[in-house]
Amino acid sequence: MLAIGLMSGTSLDGVDVALIETNGEKQVKPLNFASYPYSDTDKACLREACRRALTMAAPCFIPEDEVIYQAEHIVTLRHIQAVKDFLKKNALGNQAIKVIGFHGQTIAHRPDLGWTWQIGDGAALAQATKISVVDDFRSHDVQAGGEGAPLLPIYHWALFSEASHPLAVLNLGGIANITWIGADENDLIACDTGPANGMIDDWVKAKTGLDYDESGLIASKGVVHHDLVDAMMSQKFFSQLPPKSLDRSDFSIEAVANLSIEDGAATLTAFTAESVARSLSFFPERPSKIIVAGGGRHNVTMMKMLHDSLKMPVQPIEDFHLNGDATEAEGFAYLAVRRVFNKPISFPKTTGVPHPMTGGRIHYI
């Protein structure tokens, strides 16, 4: 069946839209992809919503605080606009699409407190597009005692089920997460490994006003302060066994505050590489290769540091004729189809749930 997946990640770049054909098992055919950037005004509102959400004891729309209301309206509207434009440009009628997988925008992820919060009105999206929508993918997992993340390991398995195993798929978004893939769908281990683009973006934004370090050019001119990398790696998270997950706010740029822009970028990039390397020690067997998706694969300096730290092949997912910018959006299309068929999307070794379980709320049309 045809399904659309929507993703707006913690980097707050915009809305990614992907179209795939899948049966919710091994059959997956990515078909098309487009990205719709948020405006600077949208990004500012979403950042403030994230800041406020992290001060709360639980998800709660406070009547006198309009910021999160406004943020949810922005997220919903931008996703509606993106889907309608995508359908039009691809000459697709809404009847052709079985389901939309709508991740929403994470504004706080606190599995330690028993909750996670993705804003965006799935019912409104379904009504506006006249296509059934699956949203709220993470809550069921967290309520069952899981981490609620990462959720894409089963999609990574579908993409590489016929490849030589074991291998690992590394997604470099705001946060980095890794999936170790063994022989079958029950042989998956996954976790967040640490910050990826998020801290570097924050550093570059604070120092230059730019949104990110394009191609890792700033970092390439800097010197890595290994003592600071070691200090950041001493945090408890990095010695914890998977499954484990992070909120983008769990780490800050304070550790590199006294460095030059170049040295700070280099040190934070090395921190990402070292945290990924550390994660390999948790797997039962060293993977034969690391396949990289997500925006971080465009960072030449990060990819080189990963190769140097991991001492194994580190290949962009494009080497396998896939689009690394589309992988997350494709994944939520795939998860939506699995939800329609009531198939599990999270597993004990990927999120820590007690047994394989499905997730997501369906808004039927």
UniProtKB/Swiss-Prot annotation:
Catalyzes the specific phosphorylation of 1,6-anhydro-N-acetylmuramic acid (anhMurNAc) with the simultaneous cleavage of the 1,6-anhydro ring, generating MurNAc-6-P. Is required for the utilization of anhMurNAc either imported from the medium or derived from its own cell wall murein, and thus plays a role in cell wall recycling. Its EC number is 2.7.1.170. HAMAP family: AnhMurNAc_kinase. Belongs to the anhydro-N-acetylmuramic acid kinase family. InterPro entries: Anhydro_N_Ac-Mur_kinase, ATPase_NBD. GO terms for molecular function: ATP binding; kinase activity; phosphotransferase activity, alcohol group as acceptor. This is Anhydro-N-acetylmuramic acid kinase. Keywords: ATP-binding, Carbohydrate metabolism, Kinase, Nucleotide-binding, Transferase. It comes from Zymomonas mobilis subsp. mobilis (strain ATCC 31821 / ZM4 / CP4). The keyword Kinase applies.
